[in-house]
């Protein structure tokens, strides 16, 4: 059973995420508000999910600390603000859209079908966008692999909608899988759960190998 910590970044959408996980047979979870984090939470959990939220990542210093501590140590999925926070911590920049998007349906394009989170999604599947900032694709750090884009809201340039870390089980989704607008929303969460399970199996195998050599 996966022990998942969900960070509530003061956004009502977090309860839709909880609804997706509430009856999941392989996940137990706790929900903690970002401003109530005390610093030792991840000693009790296997993976971290960062919720959407208003504002920009630097307004959430405790979430940013968890990301800094987590890279290379536990799986992370960031949604919307969480996606932006992971990218910014790893060296990406954000740029502001000309007009905020709220409940904007958009098709996913250029999907990386080898990706464990978005790879099983059909090209052109609709996702719900609720954001006024986006991760800049121009200077995306080399450690992040783009895995899906969306048609630009007000330009012909496609905007980054998903990424994964090149080395670690760290993933970002700019859109909201928990939105009713998003088709196959559960599939994105299930993809992350499967990746966490894969990571836990690898850790267990590594520990068994080390123990047998002692």
Regions of interest found by a model, annotated:
Residues 28-31, 94, 146:
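Generic structural signal for residues in well-ordered beta-strands
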Residues 114-167:
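Catalytic beta-strand/loop cores that center a nucleophilic Ser/Cys/Thr
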Residues 33-34, 96, 129:
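Short loop/edge segments at beta-strand edges and connector loops
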Residues 54-56, 134, 178-180:
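Short histidine/acidic/glycine/proline-rich micro-motifs that form metal-
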Residues 1-72, 79-81, 183-184, 190-214:
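N-terminal beta1-alpha1 cap of cysteine-dependent amidohydrolase-like domains
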Residues 45-120, 124-126, 189:
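Cysteine-nucleophile active-site neighborhood
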Residues 155-200:
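A glycine-centered loop/beta-turn motif at secondary-structure junctions
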Residues 80, 131, 176:
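Histidine-centered divalent metal-coordination motifs
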């Amino acid at each position: 059973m996966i022990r998942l910590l969900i960070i509530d970044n003061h956004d009502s959408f977090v309860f839709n995420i909880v609804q997706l996980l509430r009856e999941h047979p392989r996940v137990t979870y706790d929900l903690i508000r970002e401003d109530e984090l005390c610093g030792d939470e991840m000693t009790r959990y296997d993976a971290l999910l960062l919720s959407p939220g208003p504002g920009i990542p630097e307004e959430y210093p405790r979430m940013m600390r968890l990301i800094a501590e987590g890279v290379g140590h536990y799986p992370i999925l960031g949604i919307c603000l969480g996606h932006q926070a992971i990218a910014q911590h790893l060296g990406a920049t954000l740029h502001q859209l000309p007009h905020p998007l709220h409940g904007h349906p958009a098709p996913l394009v250029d999907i990386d079908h080898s990706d464990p989170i978005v790879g099983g999604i059909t090209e052109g599947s609709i996702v719900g966008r609720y954001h006024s900032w986006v991760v800049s694709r121009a200077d995306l750090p080399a450690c992040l692999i783009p895995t899906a884009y969306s048609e630009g809201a007000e330009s012909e340039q496609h905007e980054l909608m998903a990424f994964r870390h090149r080395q670690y089980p760290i993933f970002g989704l700019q859109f909201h899988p928990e939105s009713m607008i998003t088709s196959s929303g559960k599939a994105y969460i299930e993809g992350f759960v499967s990746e966490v399970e894969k990571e836990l199996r690898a850790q267990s195998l590594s520990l068994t190998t080390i123990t047998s050599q002692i």
